[in-house]
Amino acid sequence: MKLPRLRTILLTPLVLIALLYLAGVIMVARIDRTVGPLKGEPAGHRTVAIFGASGTAGDGILKAALADPHVDTVHVITRRETPRIREGVDSGKVVMTTHMDYLDYAAIREQLAGVDAVYWAIGISSVGVDEETYGLIHVDFPMAFVEQWVPVSAKDNISFHYISSSDISEDSSAMWVREKVRAENSLFGFADGTKMKVIAYRPDYIGPTQEEAHLGQRALYGFFRPLGAAVKATEIGQAMLEVTARGDEFASGDKLGTFSIVRYAGAYELRQSSTSPSQ
């Protein structure tokens, strides 16, 4: 086989992939991501709690909450401290509680009674993990929490924001998908008829915060973001804060995919840039 022909054979798939990638980028760029302005005053979210703040998504949520002038207190429930958590504690905005048993919350019920919204980011990869352990962490942990939080809450309306996963379906044969679906259905079902609403967030690839990201993660984020298949961890936090502030615009059982997360994070940034803490 002659060299020019071999080169053509090798390059053709690469060119096709590049063209498909470019087409995807163009399609995503044309999507309208604007969100209407917040109607009325923001719903109360002066006091929030974050579970999983030591992980990738949780670190971004905490970073967003620390930067929000409308959030007075952030309860961080964690097994270990991180530089971000320490920064929050030193600022006086974060109350850190070391907690080891995520099936029993009796020791922290009093401090959680005054929480307006909970941002739940506890999770692990399914690689090398059996179904029982994965279900314990992704289903049993959050269910145990909401079952114990709702009865002691002193607030009239509370919200629970759960990080799920993109493209999940009850028809899937994958273990981790089944468990994510079970988690959503269990949380939505429990919230029905209570003063708590549950919102699920279904991001694709989550890019770590600038301080935590390594070269490989930056490369993956840079590849997937133009395709609309990546979101920054801080954007998840901003979207959660915006959804919380919009109150009745969202109902229990609502789900936000990557595009919606990015849209509401953008709406959050726009609102913050045009208002002051006193407004």
Predicted regions mapped to residue ranges:
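Conserved Rossmann-fold NAD(P)-dependent oxidoreductase catalytic core, especially the SDR/UDP-sugar
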Residues: 47, 124, 132-136, 140-181, ...
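N-terminal Rossmann NAD(P)H-binding glycine-rich loop of SDR-like oxidoreductase domains
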Residues: 36-70
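C-terminal helical subdomain
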Residues: 225-253
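Conserved catalytic Lys-bearing alpha helix of Rossmann-like short-chain dehydrogenase/reductases
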Residues: 74, 139-145, 179-187, 233-236
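Conserved beta-loop-beta element that borders a ligand/cofactor-binding pocket
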Residues: 72, 185-210
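N-terminal membrane-anchoring alpha-helices
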Residues: 1-41
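Short, polar loop motifs at secondary-structure junctions
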Residues: 77-84, 205
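NAD(P)H-binding glycine-rich loop region in Rossmannoid oxidoreductase-like domains
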Residues: 48, 90-144
